[in-house]
Amino acid sequence: MNIFRGEERNKMTNNDKVPELTNGEFDEFVKKGVVLIDFFAEWCMPCLMMASVIDEVSEKIGRKVKFGKVNVDDNQEIARKFNVSSIPNILIFKNGKIVENFIGAVSQEELEERLGEYI
């Protein structure tokens, strides 16, 4: 059972600027433009570190890239669809197609560089 909801969850993930997506919202969200999706779990320490990095990058380049996150515990269907078995797992989409996938925490500079290839 997940005891964290809404504002409490966002505080815990330190990532309240990036919307958390559900199964029903996902496909429409990644359909157009460059989109970064962060697959995470609340109990994952590297995910918490990555959440801060994603927050910073989203503030910096949020007009050029859409950012979203998916809790793998709450949205197992999406995680299975994209074969997410390790977290944090970052997928970058361009117009609905995956253009990059990487696992693990990266620096803000590296994330900006990876996104820069697609914007």
Predicted regions and their residues:
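N-terminal leader/targeting and pre-domain segments
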Residues: 2-33, 117
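Short acidic active-site motifs
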Residues: 25, 74-78, 110
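Conserved helix-turn-beta segment immediately C-terminal to the redox Cys motif
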Residues: 32-36, 51-70
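Short pre-active-site segment immediately N-terminal to redox-active cysteine/selenocysteine motifs
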Residues: 33, 40-43, 86
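Conserved redox-active cysteine motifs that mediate thiol-disulfide chemistry
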Residues: 39-53
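Structural micro-motif
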Residues: 76, 82-91
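Non-catalytic, surface beta->alpha helical segment in thiol-disulfide oxidoreductase systems
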Residues: 86, 92-119
